[in-house]
Structures are given as structure tokens and as C-alpha cells.
């Protein structure tokens, strides 16, 4: 089978290659999926480029030679003891708790990583959902009282997580401020954002505005600056960002906002087929939609990874595997 393979860290055009590799076989409680589509996440980029976060799984060389966690496809075969799925079932899911390997014609998944695709949902849209959509959903759930009177800020709003979170927050009638580079202004306003801030022109922690909830995908501010931008009782949910910021929020977030009943913390992502299915059903019903920046064939996978690494993508970057 064909797969995008890499054996050392570096730029995608230098280390990523399309190769013929043996097709994996499903073991007990596993399913072999013929991959139709896969999405590219920042976590793929981090592992490919060998950023400090990306080297957590492999300090000196890549742990997973074939990246790709979010997939959609059709069950080709099932392993021993599998009763939840059978060949021919359309499925999707996040393989990041298992073997990865989604940037290939076939991938092995644990049954607990997959859900059936709802009727009316295509493979590209299904593969776009898992990590980005579930992160957005889990982040907003930290503030169950969100509603028409709520002020929300999304930092790094133009990527996969942010474009999902923006739609979900607007569905709850919240007032949503988004922060990203100016090139994404029109797309985010068209998606429903009430206010746009270009981070290259203004610092959202310095304008005096305060929010009930801040969801930050690219956190770079100190806990004190975050706290000043939250209302009394407000909450900060950090999904990603610079390692020093992540460490500061993890260590100090529980103390910094205590006087004003604020909560500052990191979101510990939990891959969830149930969350993925809920989001997929919303997409199939037309109340939510994955924003697709572009679709690349498997042979141009290096371009897809480079697009994510550039920071210019609006929404999800996708790889179409099955022709």
C-alpha cells in the first residue's frame, strides 16, 4: 500500500516521502480501515518538524513513521473478537491514542477509536471532525452556562479548533471575539464572529475588555495577563501554545484567579468517539460544518503539512486518499 513515511525530523519537503509499505493487519479488538480521507492537525506538524512538543513521543527520532490520526473510510477487515463493526461499514475516528498511520491507504484502529459515519456525511467532512471538533466541544463544555449574555474570546480562531468553536459558541448566542492574523478577518466575520482582532496590531489582554470564557489555541501570555482579561468568575481554557506559557498556566492557574473566582487551566484532550459522533450528527443535519481550507491528494501530502505549518490555513487541511 502507499503511505506517507518519514524517518527523521525536518521540513516536509525534505523528510516526507510517498512509499510502498506492507499493509497492516488487524489484531484482536482492532479494525482495518481503507482510508478515504485524513485530516492534518498541528500535532502532525509538531511530530514531523520535531518541535519540543512533537519530540515528546520520540526525543531523537520519530516514534510513528506514518502520521495521521483523524481518518474516515470503510472497514476492510476486522480482528478477533470484533462485533461492533463489520466489513463495509463507513467509519471515522481519531487514532492518536493508538498507532496513528492515517496518511496511508489502510490504517489499523482500535474499535474504541471509531464511530459509524451518519448518513449524509462525506468522508472529507467526517475526517475533519475528530481532533479539532472534539477539542472545541470539550473546551466550550468547561463553561456550561454559555448563552446570550456570555462574552467569549477565541485566540487562534482561524484554524480547525477555532472555526468549530466559533460556530458552536454562536449557536449558543454568545458574543464572540476572535483573534488571528488579518488575512483571516473576512472568513471569520462571515462565519459569525462579532469582533475581530489582528494579533499583529493589537494585544487582546491590553485593551481593557473582559470575557466570561477565553479559549486559547496559541497561548503566549502570562497567567496574570489572562486573569486581567477575564470577568469575575471567568474561565481560561488553554488548548495549545508556547511551552513556557503552558507550564505557567499549569503551575499557577489555580492560584492567580482565585480571589476573583476565576479558573485558569489547560484542557487535557480526551479522544472520544461519542463526541465525534455528536459533532458528525450536527454536521449531517447542517447545523455545523467543517471549514475546509484545501484538499490534497496523498502524493501531495508534503504540501498539506507545509500548509498547516505556515499558519495560513483557515479551518482544516485535508488529504484525500482513496481515488
Predicted regions and their residues:
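A short acidic, Gly/Pro-enriched loop at the edge of an enzyme's catalytic core
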Residues: 205-213
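Glycine-rich phosphate-binding loop and adjacent beta-alpha segment
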Residues: 221-287, 320-323
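C-terminal capping/lid region of NAD(P)-dependent oxidoreductase domains
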Residues: 287-291, 305-323
Amino acid at each position: 500500500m502507499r503511505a506517507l513515511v518519514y524517518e527523521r525530523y525536518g521540513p516536509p519537503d525534505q523528510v516526507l516521502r510517498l512509499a510502498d509499505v506492507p499493509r497492516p493487519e488487524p489484531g484482536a479488538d482492532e479494525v482495518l480501515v481503507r482510508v478515504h480521507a485524513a485530516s492534518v492537525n498541528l500535532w502532525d506538524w509538531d511530530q514531523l518538524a520535531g518541535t519540543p512538543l512533537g519530540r515528546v513521543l520520540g526525543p531523537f527520532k520519530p516514534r510513528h513513521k506514518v502520521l495521521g490520526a483523524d481518518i474516515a473510510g470503510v472497514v476492510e477487515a476486522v480482528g478477533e473478537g470484533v462485533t461492533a463493526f463489520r466489513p463495509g461499514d463507513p467509519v471515522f475516528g481519531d487514532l492518536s491514542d493508538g498507532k496513528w498511520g492515517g496518511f496511508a491507504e489502510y490504517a489499523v484502529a482500535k474499535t474504541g477509536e471509531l464511530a459509524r459515519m451518519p448518513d449524509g456525511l462525506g468522508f472529507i467532512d467526517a475526517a475533519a471532525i475528530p481532533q479539532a471538533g472534539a477539542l472545541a466541544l470539550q473546551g466550550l463544555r468547561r463553561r456550561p452556562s454559555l448563552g446570550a449574555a456570555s462574552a467569549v474570546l477565541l485566540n487562534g480562531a482561524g484554524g480547525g479548533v477555532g472555526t468549530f468553536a466559533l460556530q458552536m459558541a454562536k449557536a449558543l448566542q454568545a458574543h464572540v471575539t476572535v483573534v488571528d492574523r488579518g488575512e483571516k478577518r473576512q472568513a471569520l466575520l462571515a462565519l459569525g464572529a462579532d469582533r475581530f482582532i489582528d494579533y499583529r496590531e493589537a494585544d487582546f489582554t491590553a485593551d481593557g475588555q473582559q470575557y466570561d470564557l477565553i479559549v486559547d489555541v496559541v497561548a503566549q501570555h502570562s497567567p496574570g495577563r489572562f486573569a486581567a482579561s477575564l470577568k469575575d468568575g471567568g474561565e481560561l481554557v488553554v488548548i495549545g501554545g508556547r511551552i513556557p506559557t503552558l507550564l505557567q498556566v499549569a503551575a499557577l492557574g489555580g492560584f492567580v484567579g482565585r480571589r476573583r473566582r476565576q479558573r485558569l487551566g489547560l484542557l487535557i484532550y480526551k479522544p472520544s468517539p461519542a463526541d465525534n459522533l455528536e459533532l458528525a450528527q450536527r454536521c449531517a443535519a447542517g447545523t455545523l460544518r467543517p471549514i475546509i481550507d484545501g484538499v490534497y491528494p496523498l502524493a501531495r501530502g508534503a504540501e498539506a503539512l507545509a500548509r498547516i505549518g505556515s499558519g495560513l490555513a483557515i479551518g482544516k487541511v485535508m488529504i484525500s486518499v482513496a481515488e
